[in-house]
Swiss-Prot record:
Recorded superkingdom: Bacteria
Annotated active site: D8, D129
Pfam families, per the entry: His_biosynth (PF00977)
Designated name of the protein: 1-(5-phosphoribosyl)-5-[(5-phosphoribosylamino)methylideneamino] imidazole-4-carboxamide isomerase
Recorded GO CC terms: cytoplasm
Organism per entry: Gloeobacter violaceus (strain ATCC 29082 / PCC 7421)
Catalysis: reaction(s): 1-(5-phospho-beta-D-ribosyl)-5-[(5-phospho-beta-D-ribosylamino)methylideneamino]imidazole-4-carboxamide = 5-[(5-phospho-1-deoxy-D-ribulos-1-ylimino)methylamino]-1-(5-phospho-beta-D-ribosyl)imidazole-4-carboxamide
Similarity comment: Belongs to the HisA/HisF family.
Protein's gene: hisA
Places the protein is found: Cytoplasm
This protein's record includes keyword Iron: no
Pathway(s) where this gene product acts: Amino-acid biosynthesis; L-histidine biosynthesis; L-histidine from 5-phospho-alpha-D-ribose 1-diphosphate: step 4/9
InterPro entries: Aldolase_TIM, His_biosynth, HisA_bact_arch, Isoase_HisA-like, Isoase_HisA-like_bact, RibuloseP-bd_barrel
């Protein structure tokens, strides 16, 4: 299972939000490029970069920082935030990003998802950011009436390469991922799932590992890495290709 550090960029800085609230952003680095290089140096197999300003404005803002990250780290980089046109997607992919993640477009413009999948193939993923089981859009500021698993099925039919699932109410809380919803999602579709939101301990990573046979491909970790609650090297040893075990903790069971 991939352990993927998150790099969220707001006003040019590396920040973490709390439950998607921009007003509660905490800065963990003034230079996102330096932060990215550090995670790559520590062995991150992939980086998850989000342009929070772009998500709010509807078009990518921090493309220079993104390009600098892509050129300076050896691992693949995936990017999301404000990708609501084929031109924006193309511009980001042209900068060397391995995979782009479209969120709002999945709800408001599925035709764009189809076009991107036809044109760019496996480099297109969607982000399903949920609040109470309903998909949120426009930088998490609005909640739609679309249910997560229903939309996931539609996106699978369009040919997306992966689905990034974020439980917004778990995001930044360090209280553990929403395992119940993740299990529902992995059971609903066959496309690889990447979990995001709530990881606060190494045990949380192992809980998620129990879902790998069901289709969980990776986990994005943000605040816990920056606070030191989760050590990247330990997480990689626990759940990466050379992991300690293939069994979850004793108190974890899935039907």
């Amino acid at each position: 299972m991939d352990i993927i550090p998150a790099i969220d960029i707001l006003d040019g800085r590396c920040v973490r939000l709390y439950q998607g609230n921009y007003q509660l952003a905490e800065t963990y680095g003034e230079d996102p490029v330096a932060v990215a290089c550090n995670w790559a140096k520590l062995g991150a197999p992939r980086l998850h970069v989000v342009d929070l300003d772009g998500a709010r404005q509807g078009m990518p803002v921090h493309l220079d920082a993104l390009e600098a990250i892509v050129t300076q780290v050896p691992c693949p980089v995936q990017f999301g935030g404000g990708l609501r046109s084929i031109e924006a997607v193309s511009a980001v992919l042209d900068r060397g990003v391995d995979r782009v993640i479209l969120g709002t477009a999945a709800v408001e413009n599925p035709a764009l998802i189809r076009e991107c999948c036809e044109r760019f193939g496996g480099r297109i993923a969607v982000g399903l950011d949920a609040r109470g089981g309903q998909v949120a859009v426009r930088g998490w500021r609005e909640t739609s009436e679309v249910e997560v698993t229903e939309l996931a099925g539609e996106m699978e039919k369009l040919g997306v390469s992966a689905i990034v699932y974020t439980d917004i109410l778990k995001d930044g809380t360090l209280t553990g991922p929403n395992l119940v919803e993740l299990q529902r999602l992995t059971d609903a579709v066959k496309v690889p799932i990447i979990a995001s939101g709530g990881v606060g301990t190494l045990a949380d990573v192992l809980y998620l590992l129990a879902l790998e046979p069901r289709g969980l491909q990776g986990v994005i970790i943000g605040r816990a890495l920056y606070t030191g609650d989760v050590d990247l090297a330990e997480a990689l040893r626990a759940a990466g290709p050379s992991r300690w075990q293939d069994l979850p903790p004793d108190d974890v069971a899935f039907a």
